[in-house]
Amino acid sequence: MSKVLILKSSILGGYSQSAVLIDHLASHWETQGAAITVRDLGGKDVLPMVDGEIASGLRGGAELSARQQEMLALSDTLVAELKANDTIVIAAPMYNFTIPAQLKNWIDFIARAGVTFTYTETGPKGLVEGKRAVLVTTRGGAHKDGPTDHVVPYLKTVLGFIGITNVEVVYAEALNMGPEAHDKGMSEAKHSIDQLKA
């Protein structure tokens, strides 16, 4: 049985197009027997914003404040959750040409030297290996493979850095370019999702 971690990151609630697609994917994969865990980073599971105190605490050490200890424990939980699943599904709506701050914050909590990556004499090495990632990205315009897409290249870089190089992408484009374009973009994305195996 495949274990799947789904990360939602939209702040739009019921208006979220990425949430519609993620729910479609979850329903599709549940029929295949996948065990799914959902973390709603833009809703009920929003994380504290990583600031200087938290960033310092995530490096560990003997003299941590109570807040740093709490945030380090949270980071450990998020990393354990990441490592416990076979597939990571990331809902990545494009906000002002990049990912939501809530998703970037999750990355800041899990990207830890000595925990999810390490530095060697030959360069960095990811420690979260043998995983698969699926990116579901929604955008109002058409940006795929263009210079304005800072979502997919960035996420592929981050995932590769921690060891996840098997990355598939589902695009839903031109969603704000009229009703016909919206319906076409969502339909094509759902079709792509239907081809994915859990």
Curated annotation (Swiss-Prot):
FMN binds at residues 10, 16-18, 94-97, 138-141. Binds 1 FMN per subunit. It comes from the Bacteria. The keyword Lipoprotein does not apply. Its cofactor is FMN. It catalyses: 2 a quinone + NADH + H(+) = 2 a 1,4-benzosemiquinone + NAD(+); N,N-dimethyl-1,4-phenylenediamine + anthranilate + 2 NAD(+) = 2-(4-dimethylaminophenyl)diazenylbenzoate + 2 NADH + 2 H(+). Homodimer. PANTHER family: FMN-DEPENDENT NADH-AZOREDUCTASE 1, FMN-DEPENDENT NADH:QUINONE OXIDOREDUCTASE. This is FMN-dependent NADH:quinone oxidoreductase. It comes from Shewanella baltica (strain OS195). The lineage of its organism: Bacteria, Pseudomonadati, Pseudomonadota, Gammaproteobacteria, Alteromonadales.
